[in-house]
Amino acid sequence: MEPAGPAPGRLGPLLFCLLLSASCFCAGASGKELKVTQADKSVSVAAGDSATLNCTVSSLTPVGPIKWFKGEGQNRSPIYSFIGGEHFPRITNVSDATKRNNMDFSICISNVTPEDAGTYYCVKFQKGIVEPDTEIKSGGGTTLYVLAKPSSPEVSGPDSRGSPGQTVNFTCKSYGFSPRNITLKWLKDGKELSHLETTISSKSNVSYNISSTVSVKLSPEDIHSRVICEVAHVTLEGRPLNGTANFSNIIRVSPTLKITQQPLTPASQVNLTCQVQKFYPKALQLNWLENGNLSRTDKPEHFTDNRDGTYNYTSLFLVNSSAHREDVVFTCQVEHDSQPAITENHTVRAFAHSSSGGSMETIPDNNAYYNWNVFIGVGVACALLVVLLMAALYLLRIKQKKAKGSTSSTRLHEPEKNAREITQIQDTNDINDITYADLNLPKEKKPAPRVPEPNNHTEYASIETGKLPRPEDTLTYADLDMVHLNRAQPTPKPEPSFSEYASVQVQRK
């Protein structure tokens, strides 16, 4: 009797167990021999280029697919599979699929972006009959570095302007560079700054950003200054990128005020000048106040440039002094760059008004300027006094010359006083026999000696009287209207006489 065979219903499970045991044995035996090799530990490419990731296996058994993953562990993500039917944009198989027993499973990533940076793994799977494929071997991984250039540095300053003496911060930022290594430094007018803080951040270790802040103390000379943020990276090939910021955009220099005046004009007007000096920027409004009341507003458009970058502005204000009978305070008020107004005062003091009109005296706030005006006034007064004195002396001298040239005096001298000069006396008892008249003619400058001329003459005067004088008369006056001058040829003399006499002969009855 032949033994009975296995029941038909039990044959299926038995075959399945045998096949499973054989598969496990074959997998164990071949697992010891299978090798997955990724020859390149790292690959670096520039953004936009293509990157090739190599992978080879030592055996095609056990049967199962090969897949590529980015990352490892639970966070890894599949990027490519050699099983047909799946589509992966930008990734292609670079192996020769027509080659028999092809063991090359390399891939190529085109148009690489910084987000593609990371570590990639080539993994061998064993195909499962019932269960999913099982990972049996992985390569060592290839790190992809995307060489991304940093963006141009962006430099920003404070939101509002600062004054000299204040400390302000500048910030420099650059984005999207890879790898992480980067160098950043600050320069001011060619000199490197040291007070800075720099941080580097990344987004999933794909690309990096850098931010740096530097502190600078402002000075009045910084209007023409600027700061430079310099970034150096391997992708720049020795040509660093620069970002700049000008101090002229963040500095404010407040003006100084000075009021001066010119002397009072004949039209009773005073010219006041407000000098606004060394300010920056140009944003300026000037107001003239009269005793606190707005009188005029200037919004200048033309300025005087200084070498240090600041500006000057001068405003003129004409004051009609005759319209004021009391002291007036004029104020120069300046509003600069939306800052609180600064002021400078100037007092104009009224003089006592006369019937012909009034006048005013300007009293500057500056004592030195006032003293200078006093010195000028004293000097002018002294000069006028000297001129008046010289004019008076000149007029007096002219008057004396006219008096000498237009008048002459004739006087009769008593004979007793001139007795020694009389050559002949007719009667000693009559004192009125002969009377001499002294003609004091104006003396002229003594002329230079010259040769006597034959026409030199002597002048005589004869006086006729109608009656005899009384004995008691001692003086006889001669009316010049009765004097007749006769010319006669005199004997030449070596030198002319300076006194002329007229002999008068009185006839007796």
Curated annotation (Swiss-Prot):
Keywords carried by this UniProt record: Disulfide bond, Glycoprotein, Immunoglobulin domain, Membrane, Phosphoprotein, Repeat, SH3-binding, Signal, Transmembrane, Transmembrane helix
Signal peptide span: 1-31
Modification Phosphotyrosine, positions: Y436, Y460, Y477, Y501
GO molecular function, one term: protein phosphorylated amino acid binding
Parts of the chain that traverse the membrane: 374-394
Annotated SUPFAM superfamilies: Immunoglobulin (SSF48726)
Protein name, as recorded: Tyrosine-protein phosphatase non-receptor type substrate 1
Designated gene of the protein: Sirpa
